């Protein structure tokens, strides 16, 4: 029997090529993990999270990269978009963790 409430990803009728874009976002995020600065094995983002400032840090970076979008001549606009999406995902995970902690 087909599960109509949870269709396979391929069955969704995407209008804006979201499936491909999600794959590109995943590839971008994967590529960043060998570029992070770390101290004692922790990324700076993890240290910021530990200090209780991750939400503001993510929102600030989302704003920063949104304001930079298309401003630098010769820069790939997608790079700023990828950073925005990555910080949004980190923020979503932080919010999910906060929601789990408040239950």
Regions found by a protein language model. Give the residues of each.
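Intrinsically disordered, low-complexity regulatory regions
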Residues: 1-103
């Amino acid at each position: 029997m087909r599960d109509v409430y949870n269709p396979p990803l391929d069955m969704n009728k995407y209008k804006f090529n979201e499936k491909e874009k999600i794959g590109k976002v995943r590839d971008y995020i994967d590529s960043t993990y060998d570029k992070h600065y770390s101290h004692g094995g922790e990324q700076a983002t993890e240290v910021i999270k530990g200090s209780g400032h991750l939400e503001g840090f993510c929102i600030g970076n989302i704003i920063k990269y949104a304001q930079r979008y298309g401003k630098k001549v010769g820069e790939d606009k997608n790079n700023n978009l990828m950073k925005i999406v990555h910080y949004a995902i980190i923020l979503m995970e932080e919010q999910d963790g906060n929601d789990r902690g408040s239950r």
